[in-house]
Amino acid sequence: MKKKTVLALLVISSALMLFGCGKGNESADDPVVLTPIIEQIPEDEASDAAEEVAEQPVDEDVPPEEGMVRSRITNEWVDEKVNNTRPVAIMIPNSNTASQYGISDASVLYECNVEGSMTRLMGIFDDWQNIEKLGNIRSCRDYYVYWAFEWDAIYIHYGGPFYIDDIIGRDDTQNVNCITFTDATYRDEAKNSTDNAFTSPDRIRKAMDHYGYPMEYRENYADAQHYMFAPAGSPNTLEQYPDAISASKIDMSKCYPVTNCYFLYNEETGTYDRYQKLSGSTEGPHIDMANNKQLSFKNVIVQNTYHEVRDQKGYLAFQCHDTTRDGYYFTNGKGIHVTWKKESDYGSTRYYDDNGDEVLMNTGKTMVLIVEDGDSFTADEKALTAKK
């Protein structure tokens, strides 16, 4: 029981009168003894007060350090300067001979088929000025440029087929072709001689200075709010959807038969860890050679997309602008069916649940898997495909 002491003070004038009436040998200088009065606070009130202090909510939107803001790409805390700097979009091969550096730092990672059922990756890097080595860099495919547009990113590639000429030649396209501007890359030790072109922050800045590209976002291009994020303190668990499916494993091997990638939900981290079995390689975690980290994502999106085969070489075309296609959104070990819309070159691809509401993504990195319409994949061995 908590106690508080209330001192009963004697009125000085009354004390003098009392001592004056005493025996002659008693002195007015004798000390006055003050008797404490003990008041007890009821136990239930004390516990209520303690609980009230303990239940004070933590404000998730208070920056951990001065000068930090929520990233427009991941909703994570980043330095305000990073948030105001345009990201870079880098084309990265995904084969057993690829030497991938810095890929685990991509805020958003796209994967899509190219010719021969191989996949190519494109990383959107917001904090690229703090990544020592990025790459290796490979050639462009025109449909990736439209996804890079959504972020107003500087698009970095190593040449590409003639199909890219129109979009790369546009005045508003701000790209760095490492064949044309050789100072943007350097050759370094790699698994083979065709996958050894890398870049770095100083080389990217040099290329941007050369072409006169602004470091900060251009006005009236990409949407300032791309993904819609749930509050960091109240993540989207998908429990509000009665038809949400279990998704502890997302297997994309039928869509990507050369990559054979899949994702396992990690309950300890709350993210999806990426694995793959590349043609000619062994199965295992997808690892960034720069830091030996496995690729991991808070959000995984499967985006069914109309496609065509362009020629006998197998070059593909994907319809990046659409309002009629669907897909799936996965997070926290569950998934829901979604539809998606992209209505302009720089407009964001937006995802909607079956109620027509825009899906709230969770704070963290996002994997976007572009699949050919009609292809199927599995979530916990349940086959899923487009609902046309």
What are these regions (language model features)?
Residues 1-5, 11:
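Positively charged n-region of N-terminal signal peptides that target proteins for export
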Residues 5-7, 26, 73-75:
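Sequence-pattern detector for short linear motifs
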Residues 9-10, 43:
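Compositionally biased, low-complexity segments
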Residues 17-20:
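C-terminal motif of bacterial Sec signal peptides marking the signal peptidase cleavage site
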Residues 22-24:
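Bacterial signal peptide processing site
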Residues 30-39, 51-110, 115-388:
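A surface/extracellular/periplasmic glyco- and lipid-processing/surface-interacting theme
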